[in-house]
């Protein structure tokens, strides 16, 4: 072999200390070892250098380690790939075939090398093998990996000669690069220096021809897991980069970076020194300037490592070529780098390495650091030198980074965007659209710093390009799906209007653009729009608002916005404007009116507040569940980390005002204006002064941004805690309505109060009287009127109600909370929420009132009732006589803290909303402020003196002045009956839509569109009417209580030091007598009932924490009489229709009501003080009795362990030792409560493998595991499965003793309908296979069958775990048993996914086995495997066929394979299988077909389970160590161009456009889809099912323009997508042909015809066969003719490929046509003449089938055969 050029290996430069150490390690080398090679000079040079190349033999073992993970092609891959391509040789060239066979299989391939070497001169220095060159290169690569020293030498010599013969011109062949470059780099670590030298020489030649490929391979060597290879590659790199002229054309950026990465590795100091030595030598060869440019491009961290190494190595004596600042590089180095090599800059702005770190999804710290570096980089950015396209790309990068899940990345990206806007200056107008689009992505974020950043961006944009241009683009997002984005858009408009002069805006256009927000479905957006219109009107000036009202008129007429004009006029009448805060946020002038504030007297109630409070445009209160960052603050921009997502409803004023609002003694206020219009469809409830309303403004002096809600974690942790530790300071603070202050002022923190998501997590109004104030048991009185209105709203007391509690001696701090309805959000479901409990407040006076939404007689107060109580429509006065409520809660400039309104109520649009009344004082006066100050100064002793006295004196619930009460009741009822609302209600009748102003609205149950009931309570279970504790579902429907009757049962939580462990009763048990209406949900009840009142005269027997309040009815005969009882205990069903009050069971105290018929006796039956019986409806009683019976049976079935783990028992121990057996739940409580609370206290999950631990007593654990698996409770099943996994991992010997019983139990759970249990069982089986290995052989049949059947599940995580379990089975059990169980379990299954999974894992078994063993004639194996492989190879699924062919491919290397095929494969399948084997020999196996887009796209659709192999990457089900054992090899597939977040965002955008209401938007969406298909096909293909699910509707759009554009677009997309359309072909064809082929529009018909033709031309006709047959059979008219003719065309093309399928499907259509066609050629009912098309189809079939067609027609009815013969040409028949 000729000597290499002498310059390849120059003499070493004066070695540095580091390099001397490196070279000295490998001095022991015998120069004579290369004597057999030519080139003595090179030997000498080689001997010197390769001593260094060899490395330290002491540190590098002589025996080569396996190369499985070193470079691109592992040895296994090389060796196992030879059975394929080798067999692809044709028989034409026997010599080449023989040589390849020698290279593959011969133990000594030297003969082949000599033959190839000898043939080189004849072939001009070329190898030959024109068709098998790739196979030859791979064979040579195999020799380099597995051959001996001599074989490797011959191979390297041959490669060297071949490369020299080819010359130095041209690129390397791709086959050579893929097969040999990795193995050549691996050869650099050879112990033999001669081999290293030869490999280095070849790489040098390759480097001149294809530098990029060689450098990439070298970098892989530098980063290989093999330490010897890394060291050898780093040491030989400088030698490879000689001479210097070679370096001029190389880009060594990545090489320098790879070497620099090793400098900071302290653990491998030797590698670090080697890398530094290589950098030194490369720097000497490159020269100072170029080396500086490379080093300065390093990331700052790597530069620091290099500098430190430089300092430690040389100190101040740095060589000239390495002269750099020892402390770091100068900052001026970076700009010159950009000039030197801009190719290293992404978007010509940021380095490639920084770009890669920005997109690193593995390490968030890497991304955050990269964003910080990007900010620094952008500080020096000069936009004038950057092209427009690069800046757009950079903004696109920032757009994508704003989707990051890490807050710091998003925040930093916004700062970068702001810096970019600043740098661009006036040039930003060219990029205005992309910048705004990026900024809009974060508008939904409620974090304060995020708001500040994007406000800076928008204000800077407005400054540079003007506000109107910015708003024009921004307002395009006013239809955004996220309500917060819509609101923020309006708020930014308000901010700009308040910042810039009106001349800078197009105010009329702005008015029309903002007008749709007035009728938005979300209350907060409507409020923002009202505020914006107030600013617009101010900007326009007086007399110029006609345009404004015209815009409102347009919306009112077009968008069903009845009442919006009145709302705008009312808002303008307030003469107040929003303002900007110091932070630049908008502060509304008008508070968001909660139902509490909207009815209180501090804010004038008008049409604008009514408009905000009402709403018929949202689905329900539950619609906010997914948007619970929405309504956090009234102040736009305030930050709230925990958002309550429940709408609350509190007591208001007007007709529905609470009793204490007008029964307080003293002087009544002067401004008691009557306003009967104030009543809407809101129910009024009382409030507890300890719990702040979620919609109340903060108290005086409290910051507006304080948070009102506790986090969910805290609420879960403090579910049932209660506290009495209130002092005089904390109580008023809580009463002021600011929970943030309550959090800081309460001793022991608010978490001890059990305030779980304050204001957000309570139950139904009529049944949940949760918070009860208590007072002196002997002197103070507690009055309550139960609200029997609709249980649709939840409330906490308004601020006015609470502040009145401390105003003086007559204050009533004992106000209650009457929660109303549940939230259907999963976050607030029973798994996450808890009932509220709070300790009572003490005062001299406790007036505890529960208001009725119907105007009713107020109970008597502490002193003589005021005559003003009779005025039912008057506003209430404050307890001090100074109109306290109205004034202290007047409009403040400080914004209110608002907590999630839910569904808007009303907005029926049936009548105009009255404008705001004039003449109402909106601001507080000095008297109010002084009153509030007095209230805050109450002495502590008032509260402390009552601290331990929690009993409530109910003895005076019997009212003294019955005449006055009755008179007031009659007055109220008369007032209501005479009202206009009552008249309208009568006119509408019982079937009319609910009238929000009618008095009956208080009794209506308001239902939403998507919820069967809003009266159920998700976070509370109930004692039902019978007293039986029962669980209520989140979406439970209303009880079918007989009309005219109503049952009510309300439970109080316990108070005092004992923890409250109660769930409050659900409103399901408090159902209304109502009739369902399609339009209104429920109409008013026609037969109202009367609720009698109880008067408890004795309180001596009341327990310390028990309160019973019984409601007083208001309908029917007002002559109610009191009745007494002394035991405040729960009642339960005992017999007949009565409720005996039983003292033995003492659940949490509550309110117990009863249903009384309209004409029932007014006085309940009283037997004695301890036994009060209340009548109920018999039907209800029967239900309750049955339920109680079932619950008791369930309880009896539970063992003692259940009681020990009972949440009630745990609560008992957590609370206080004072809990006695009397407080234990009744028999009906435990099972339901356990079910409701199990997810709160403990949610069983699948344990990670790393969490498995051994048992101290495994035998007991095994018995317990079997018992748990047999339990009916799914949670216990999960626990049992985890037990089994632990036993398998650590006690396998013990488990083997009961393996059959255990496996049987686990297999049964695999079939469990609960997906969590099923998945856990699948994981458990995988562990059993992994740890027990061949011990599982006897259990394989049942286990594998169950697993295979689960492979057809739609849940991706189930399929993933099944894949893992089966892979574990394949790897660990006996292969023969695995084959048998797989074939038995899934070969003949009907589900396509089961068969695919079976074939996949069967192929894995075959791959693991020796083909010789399979094909050796062993009957058990060959007899089962070959027929199975043949069947799978003919399956309908492409993937299944692939695995079938793979099994054949793996077995066909046996010389007797053909005989085995003939022996074991049925004769009918044999020709097809032989053809398949022949193709495999010629073409190889190929890759697995992916005909259904990317794997990601398929996995996202459960329906595609039959067409895809599920990903084998489990979600934390297995540890990383186990994945090495159980992971299924990934199917090769194209990488998705975008991440999942981008893909999801794209789908939302494109489907939103395609489904838009405006036809122009739909057309734009269609055009956008075409553009994306042309420019970004991978994205479309990856989500093709979701996209075309929206697009298919456009193919038959009602708008002909859209229809035509869609068809024309489809015609253009078909050639682009081709077979990628296969997943959607069945839904696409009906959309194309059903209406369009019968269209009278010639354009649409022609377009549809073109689409069908394009489908036939570009899509596999086999996919079209069945849909075309269906349409030809069932369509009518012209469409039937066209589809029949098109079917004939398909037959001509397809029959040769798929004769059987074509006959099977097409003949059915032909017999249908012939059998129904009349003599005239038409079909009955089909229209049109079908004879021509039928004749064409018949001739096409006859051409392909010949006489066989007539033979098959003979089996049909005679007229069909006759018709067929008539249609066929006579000349054709005569030829037969």
UniProtKB/Swiss-Prot annotation:
SMART domains: TOG. Residues 655-676, 817-921, 970-1000, 1062-1084, 1493-1536 are annotated as: Disordered. InterPro entries: ARM-like, ARM-type_fold, TOG. Pfam families: CEP104-like_TOG (PF21040). Residues 1259-1481 are annotated as: TOG 3. Keywords: Cell projection, Cilium biogenesis/degradation, Cytoplasm, Cytoskeleton, Repeat. Changing residue 364 to E: Expected to disrupt microtubule binding. Abolishes the ability to promote microtubule polymerization. Residues 826-836, 845-855, 871-892 have a biased composition (Polar residues). It comes from the Eukaryota. Its main location: other. Residues 1521-1533 have a biased composition (Basic and acidic residues). Residues 94-311 are annotated as: TOG 1. Coiled coil: none annotated. HEAT repeats lie at residues 175-212, 214-246, 250-288, 344-383, 389-426, 430-465, 466-503, 505-542, 1297-1334, 1338-1375, 1541-1578, 1582-1619, 1623-1661. Residues 351-595 are annotated as: TOG 2. GO terms for cellular component: ciliary basal body; cilium; cytoplasm. The keyword tRNA processing does not apply. Involved in ciliogenesis. It is required for appropriate acetylation and polyglutamylation of ciliary microtubules, and regulation of cilium length. Interacts with microtubules and promotes microtubule polymerization via its HEAT repeat domains, especially those in TOG region 2 and 4. The TOG regions are composed of HEAT-type repeats that assemble into a solenoid structure. They mediate interaction with microtubules. Interacts with ARMC9. Interacts with CCDC66, CEP104 and CSPP1. Belongs to the Crescerin family. This is TOG array regulator of axonemal microtubules protein 1. It comes from Mus musculus.
């Amino acid at each position: 072999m000729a000597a290499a050029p002498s310059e390849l290996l120059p003499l070493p430069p004066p070695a540095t200390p580091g390099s001397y150490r490196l070279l000295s390690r490998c001095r022991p080398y015998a120069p004579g070892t290369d004597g057999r090679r030519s080139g003595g000079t090179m030997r000498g040079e080689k001997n010197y250098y390769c001593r260094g190349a060899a490395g330290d033999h002491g540190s590098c073992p002589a025996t080569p380690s396996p190369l499985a993970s070193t470079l691109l092609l592992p040895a296994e891959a090389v060796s196992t790939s030879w059975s394929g391509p080798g067999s692809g040789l044709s028989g034409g060239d026997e010599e080449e075939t023989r040589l390849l066979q020698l290279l593959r299989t011969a133990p000594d391939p030297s003969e082949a090398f000599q033959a190839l070497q000898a043939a080189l001169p004849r072939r001009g220095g070329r190898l030959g093998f024109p068709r098998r060159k790739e196979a030859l290169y791979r064979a040579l690569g195999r020799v380099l990996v597995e051959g001996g020293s001599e074989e490797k030498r011959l191979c390297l010599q041959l490669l060297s000669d071949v490369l020299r013969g080819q010359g130095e011109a041209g690129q390397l062949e791709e086959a050579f690069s893929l097969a040999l470059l990795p193995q050549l780099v691996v050869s650099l670590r050879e112990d033999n220096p001669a081999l290293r030298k030869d490999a280095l020489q070849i790489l040098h030649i390759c480097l001149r021809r294809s530098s990029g490929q060689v450098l990439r391979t070298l970098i892989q060597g530098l980063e290989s897991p093999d330490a010897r290879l890394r060291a050898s590659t780093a040491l030989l790199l400088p030698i490879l980069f000689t001479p210097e002229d070679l370096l001029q054309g190389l880009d060594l950026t990545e090489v320098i970076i790879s070497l620099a990465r090793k400098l900071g590795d302290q653990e491998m100091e030797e590698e670090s020194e080697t890398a530094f030595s290589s950098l030194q030598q490369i720097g000497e060869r490159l020269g100072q300037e170029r080396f500086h440019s490379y080093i300065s491009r390093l990331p700052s961290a790597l530069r620091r490592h290099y500098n430190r190494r430089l300092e430690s190595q040389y100190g101040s004596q740095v060589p000239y070529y390495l002269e750099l600042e020892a402390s770091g590089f100068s900052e001026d180095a970076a700009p010159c780098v950009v000039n030197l090599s801009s190719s290293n800059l992404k978007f010509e702005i940021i380095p490639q390495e920084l770009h890669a770190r920005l997109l690193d999804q593995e390490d968030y710290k890497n991304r955050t650091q990269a964003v910080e570096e990007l900010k620094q980089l952008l500080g020096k950015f000069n936009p004038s030198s950057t092209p427009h396209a690069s800046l757009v790309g950079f903004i696109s990068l920032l757009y994508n980074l704003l989707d990051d899940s890490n807050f710091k990345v998003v925040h930093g990206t916004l700062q970068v965007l702001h810096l970019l806007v600043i740098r661009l200056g006036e040039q930003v107008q060219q990029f205005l659209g992309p910048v705004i689009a990026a900024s809009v992505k974060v508008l939904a974020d409620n974090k304060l710093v995020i708001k500040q950043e994007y406000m800076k961006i928008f204000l800077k944009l407005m400054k540079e390009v003007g506000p109107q241009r910015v708003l024009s683009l921004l307002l395009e997002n006013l239809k955004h799906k996220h309500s917060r984005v819509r609101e923020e858009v309006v708020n930014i408009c308000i901010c700009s209007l308040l910042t810039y002069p009106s001349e800078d805006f197009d105010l009329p256009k702005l008015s029309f653009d903002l007008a749709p927000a007035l009728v938005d479905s979300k209350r907060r957006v409507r409020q923002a729009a009202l505020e914006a219109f107030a600013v617009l009107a101010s900007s326009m000036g007086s007399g110029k608002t006609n345009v404004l009202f015209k815009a409102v008129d347009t919306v009112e007429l077009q968008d069903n916005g009845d009442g919006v004009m009145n709302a705008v006029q009312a808002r303008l009448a307030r003469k107040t404007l929003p303002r900007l805060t110091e932070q630049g946020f908008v502060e509304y002038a008008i508070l968001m009116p909660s139902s509490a504030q909207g009815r209180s007297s501090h804010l004038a109630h008008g049409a604008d507040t009514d408009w905000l409070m009402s709403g018929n445009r949202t689905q329900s209160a539950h619609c906010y569940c997914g948007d619970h960052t929405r309504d956090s603050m009234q102040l736009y921009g305030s930050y709230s980390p925990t958002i309550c997502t429940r709408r609350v409803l509190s007591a208001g004023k007007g007709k529905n005002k609470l009793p204490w609002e007008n029964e307080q003694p003293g002087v009544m206020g002067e401004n008691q204006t009557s306003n009967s219009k104030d009543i809407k469809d809101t129910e009024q409830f009382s409030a507890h002064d300890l719990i702040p309303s979620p919609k109340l403004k903060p108290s005086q002096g409290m910051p507006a941004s304080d948070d009102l809600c506790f986090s969910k974690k805290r609420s879960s942790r403090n579910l049932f805690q209660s506290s009495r530790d209130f002092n005089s300071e904390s109580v008023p603070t809580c009463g002021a309505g600011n929970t943030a202050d309550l959090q800081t002022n309460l001793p022991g923190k608010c978490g001890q109060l059990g305030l779980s998501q304050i204001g957000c997590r309570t139950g139904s109004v009529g049944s949940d009287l949760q918070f009860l104030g208590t007072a002196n048991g002997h002197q103070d009185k507690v009055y309550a009127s139960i609200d029997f209105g609709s249980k649709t709203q939840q409330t906490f007391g308004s601020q006015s109600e609470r502040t009145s509690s401390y105003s003086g001696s007559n204050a009533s701090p004992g106000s209650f909370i009457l929660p109303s309805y549940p939230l259907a959000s999963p976050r607030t479901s029973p798994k996450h929420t808890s009932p509220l409990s709070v300790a009572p407040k003490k005062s001299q006076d406790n007036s505890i009132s529960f208001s009725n939404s119907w105007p009713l007689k107020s109970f008597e107060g502490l002193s003589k009732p005021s005559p003003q109580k009779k005025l039912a429509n008057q506003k209430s006065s404050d307890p001090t006589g100074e109109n306290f409520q109205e004034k202290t809660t007047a409009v403040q400039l400080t914004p209110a803290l608002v907590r999630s309104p839910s569904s808007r109520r009303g907005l029926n649009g049936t009548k105009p909303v009255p404008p705001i009344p004039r003449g109402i004082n909106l601001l507080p006066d000095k008297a109010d402020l002084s009153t509030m100050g007095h209230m805050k100064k109450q002495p502590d002793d008032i509260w402390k003196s009552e601290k331990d006295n929690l009993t409530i004196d109910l003895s005076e619930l019997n009212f003294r002045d019955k005449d006055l009460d009755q008179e007031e009741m009659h007055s109220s009822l008369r007032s209501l009956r005479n009202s206009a609302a009552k008249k309208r209600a009568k006119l509408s009748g019982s079937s009319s839509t609910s009238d929000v102003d009618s008095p009956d609205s208080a009794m209506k149950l308001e239902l939403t569109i998507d919820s069967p009931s809003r009266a159920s309570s998700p976070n509370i279970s109930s004692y039902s009417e019978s007293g039986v504790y029962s669980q209520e579902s989140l979406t439970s429907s209303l009880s079918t209580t007989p009309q005219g009757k109503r049952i009510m049962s309300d439970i109080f939580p316990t108070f005092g030091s004992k923890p409250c462990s109660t769930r409050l009763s659900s409103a399901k048990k408090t159902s209304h007598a109502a009739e369902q209406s399609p339009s209104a949900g429920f109409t008013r009840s026609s037969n109202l009932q009367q609720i009698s009142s109880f008067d408890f005269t004795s309180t001596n027997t009341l327990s310390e924490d028990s309160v019973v309040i019984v409601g007083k009815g208001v309908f029917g005969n007002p002559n109610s009489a009191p009745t007494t009882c002394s035991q405040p205990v729960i009642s339960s069903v005992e017999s007949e229709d009565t409720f005996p009050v039983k003292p033995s069971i003492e659940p949490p105290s509550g309110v117990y009501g009863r249903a009384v018929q309209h004409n029932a006796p007014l006085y309940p039956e009283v037997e004695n003080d301890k036994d009060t019986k209340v009548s109920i409806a018999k039907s209800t009683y029967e239900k309750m009795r049955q339920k109680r019976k079932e619950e008791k049976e369930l309880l009896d079935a539970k063992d003692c362990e259940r009681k020990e783990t009972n949440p009630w028992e745990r609560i008992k121990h957590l609370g206080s030792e004072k809990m006695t057996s009397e407080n234990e739940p009744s028999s009906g409580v435990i099972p339901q409560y356990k079910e409701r609370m199990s997810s709160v206290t403990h949610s069983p999950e699948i344990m990670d493998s790393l969490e498995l631990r051994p048992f101290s007593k495994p035998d007991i654990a095994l018995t317990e595991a079997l018992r748990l698996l047999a339990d009916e409770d799914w949670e216990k099943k999960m626990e049992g499965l985890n037990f089994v996994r632990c036993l398998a991992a650590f006690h396998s010997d013990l488990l083997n003793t009961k393996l059959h019983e255990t496996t049987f139990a686990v297999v049964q759970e695999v079939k469990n309908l609960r997906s969590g249990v099923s998945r856990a069982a699948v994981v458990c089986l995988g562990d059993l296979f992994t740890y027990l290995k061949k011990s599982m052989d006897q259990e394989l049949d049942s286990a594998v069958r169950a697993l295979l059947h689960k492979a057809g599940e739609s849940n991706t995580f189930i399929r993933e775990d099944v894949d893992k379990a089966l892979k574990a089975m394949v790897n660990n059990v006996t292969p023969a048993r695995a084959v048998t169980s797989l074939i038995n379990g899934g070969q003949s299954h009907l589900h396509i996914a089961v068969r695919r999974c079976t074939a996949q894992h069967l192929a894995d078994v075959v791959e693991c086995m020796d083909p010789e063993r399979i094909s050796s004639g062993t009957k058990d194996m060959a007899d089962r495997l070959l027929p199975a492989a043949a069947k799978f190879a003919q399956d309908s699924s492409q993937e299944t066929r692939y695995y079938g062919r793979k099994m054949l491919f793996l077995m066909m290397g046996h010389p007797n394979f053909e005989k085995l095929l003939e022996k074991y494969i049925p004769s009918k399948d044999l020709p097809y299988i032989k053809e398949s084997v022949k193709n495999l020999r010629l073409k190889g196996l190929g890759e697995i077909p992916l005909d259904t887009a990317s794997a990601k796209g398929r996995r996202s659709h459960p329906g595609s389970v039959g067409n895809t192999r599920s990903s084998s990457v489990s979600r934390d089900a297995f540890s990383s160590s186990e994945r090495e054992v159980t992971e299924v090899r990934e199917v090769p597939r194209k990488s998705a161009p975008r991440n999942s977040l981008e893909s999801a965002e794209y789908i939302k955008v494109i489907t939103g456009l395609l489904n838009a209401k405006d036809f122009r938007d739909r057309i734009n969406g269609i055009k956008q889809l075409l553009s994306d298909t042309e420019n970004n096909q991978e994205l479309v293909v990856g989500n093709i099912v979701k996209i075309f699910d929206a697009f298919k509707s456009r193919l038959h759009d009602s708008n002909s323009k859209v229809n035509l554009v869609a068809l024309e677009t489809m015609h253009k997309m078909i050639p682009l997508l081709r077979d990628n359309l296969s997943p959607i072909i069945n839904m696409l064809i009906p959309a194309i042909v059903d209406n369009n082929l019968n269209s009278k529009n010639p354009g649409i018909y022609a377009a549809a015809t073109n689409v069908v033709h394009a489908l036939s031309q570009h899509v596999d006709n086999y996919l079209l066969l069945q849909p075309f047959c269906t349409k030809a059979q069932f369509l009518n008219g012209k469409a039937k003719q066209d589809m029949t003719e098109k079917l004939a065309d398909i037959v001509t093309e397809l029959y040769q490929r798929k004769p059987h399928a074509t006959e099977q499907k097409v003949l059915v259509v032909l017999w249908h046509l012939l059998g129904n066609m009349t003599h005239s050629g038409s079909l009955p009912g089909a229209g049109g003449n079908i004879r021509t098309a039928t004749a064409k189809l018949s001739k096409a079939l006859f051409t392909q089938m010949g006489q066989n067609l007539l033979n098959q027609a003979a089996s049909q009815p005679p007229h069909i055969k006759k018709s067929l013969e008539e249609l066929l040409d006579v000349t054709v028949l005569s030829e037969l």
